[in-house]
């Protein structure tokens, strides 16, 4: 069984440790909120605990240079099943080349919406 310990003191810094009982070892993770993701997560009611659970147990998809962590109903571990409605359908988007959280939200059709996105993020330039 995994034990997750939230070590973050700064609202823009998400630090947590995962202790694996079988291995008797811990791994430390560090993610950084952008000002946008911090603002949106507080507006959408996605707190740090929900973000940590989605990052640890969610399915990961790489598209458009971003990592999408989707925590579906079946991904929630047994010891959190009594809080299933609190955690399910949480999506955390992380930059593909760093540990920066771009945004987070909740969506019932998250996997479908991510699959429909194009492979690359299109950037339009304003030409004079």
What are the functions of these language-model segments?
Residues 1-128:
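Ribonuclease/tRNase effector modules and their secretory precursors
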């Amino acid at each position: 069984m995994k034990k997750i310990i939230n070590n973050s003191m700064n609202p823009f810094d998400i630090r947590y440790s995962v202790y694996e009982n079988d291995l008797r070892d811990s791994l430390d993770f560090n993610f950084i909120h952008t000002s946008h993701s911090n603002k949106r997560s507080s507006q959408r009611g996605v707190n740090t605990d929900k973000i940590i659970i989605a990052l640890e147990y969610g399915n990961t998809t790489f598209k458009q240079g971003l990592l999408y962590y989707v925590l579906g109903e079946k991904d929630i571990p047994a010891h959190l099943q009594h809080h299933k409605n609190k955690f399910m359908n949480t999506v955390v988007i992380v930059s593909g080349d760093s540990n920066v959280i771009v945004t987070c939200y909740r969506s019932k059709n998250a996997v479908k919406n991510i699959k429909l996105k194009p492979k690359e993020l299109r950037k339009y330039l304003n030409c004079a």
